[in-house]
Amino acid sequence: MENFPTEYFLNTSVRLLEYIRYRDSNYTREERIENLHYAYNKAAHHFAQPRQQQLLKVDPKRLQASLQTIVGMVVYSWAKVSKECMADLSIHYTYTLVLDDSSDDPYAAMMNYFNDLQAGREQAHPWWALVNEHFPNVLRHFGPFCSLNLIRSTLDFFEGCWIEQYNFGGFPGSHDYPQFLRRMNGLGHCVGASLWPKEQFDERSLFLEITSAIAQMENWMVWVNDLMSFYKEFDDERDQISLVKNYVVSDEISLHEALEKLTQDTLHSSKQMVAVFSDKDPQVMVTIECFMHGYVTWHLCDHRYRLNEISEKVKEQKTEDAQKFCKFYEQAANVGAVSPSEWAYPPVAQLANVRSKDVKNVKQIEKPLLSSIELVE
């Protein structure tokens, strides 16, 4: 295993943050905690329901961690949408993270997908059954064009996760494969379209801006995620199918060359994002900028990405990139480092346990009632 290229990672991260003029001022601390708890509380009650518990079959600790991660992502990044929209998106994207972490083969459950869809029957695949049930709660916030993007991108994401089950990095020489898979499982169009709720944006009058934002966001958000998650995935056996490592296989290049390819694409996309929308509708630009800054804050502060380890490792170094990275990290931590104990309560497992007891109590109360009716008959 190669050593992690710390200096290169620092330089790339610093350039990214400078290109987007990183300065997250999306919330006061009180507003951030309020929105985090609101979105978490609604989502936690959703996943504590008996049907969700029965069909998902996810380890409680993993579900809790997934929910906390996604609530953070949505609240930090979708800073301009309503709290209700944040909560509904948090539920939707938690479902996607649960699927992404799953290792179940979907083949058998997808045999009759289209026939069931056409006939209006519940999907055989439990994930689709639950996602479809929740989808109306998400789509009610958006116009028809954005809604279509959310539906289509979610379908693509499912297919991308299916492909990833095979741990296939592409055949050597198949240069289109890495980006094909990354676009499919990146949820870029879903994310890009979900920034524009109909109560704030008229998708007809802003159709060109919204379409362009979806196109730009598709690559920007997945490439930034790939870059910021490179450290956590570097030596994790479960994360060996990544864009960078697929470049190594398909393009037959070194890890350093693959990382450089991702770096140049990410920086170019960041420049485009700022340049394209700087003279467009001000509300559109503010929304995009808030998303970009919040999305970076989330990556820097969420423990899933372990970037605090990088900061600790280089904080005594005197190089310009190390000092700049630590300054950016401190800047992000000052606004985004909020302990889950301040907002992620009560735990989903506790809520599920209460619901389970309530169901049992109802059944116990109902049983003698039925017996009495039978006796009368």
Swiss-Prot record:
Q: Which family does it belong to?
A: Belongs to the trichodiene synthase family.
GO biological process annotation, one example:
sesquiterpenoid biosynthetic process
What are the disulphide bonds in this sequence? none
Catalysed reaction per UniProt? (2E,6E)-farnesyl diphosphate = trichodiene + diphosphate
**EC class of the enzyme, as a word:** lyase
Know the name of this protein?
Trichodiene synthase
**Pfam families from the xrefs?**
TRI5 (PF06330)
Q: What is its EC number?
A: 4.2.3.6
Task: Please verify whether the record's keywords include Hydrolase.
Answer: no
Matching InterPro entries, A to Z?
Isoprenoid_synthase_dom_sf (IPR008949), TRI5_ascomyc (IPR010458), Trichodiene_synth (IPR024652)
Function description: TS is a member of the terpene cyclase group of enzymes. It catalyzes the isomerization and cyclization of farnesyl pyro-phosphate to form trichodiene, the first cyclic intermediate in the biosynthetic pathway for trichothecenes. It serves to branch trichothecene biosynthesis from the isoprenoid pathway.
What gene is behind this protein? TRI5
Pathway the protein acts in: Sesquiterpene biosynthesis; trichothecene biosynthesis
Misc remark for this entry?
Answer: Trichothecenes are sesquiterpenoid toxins that act by inhibiting protein biosynthesis.
Q: What Gene Ontology molecular function terms does this protein carry?
A: trichodiene synthase activity
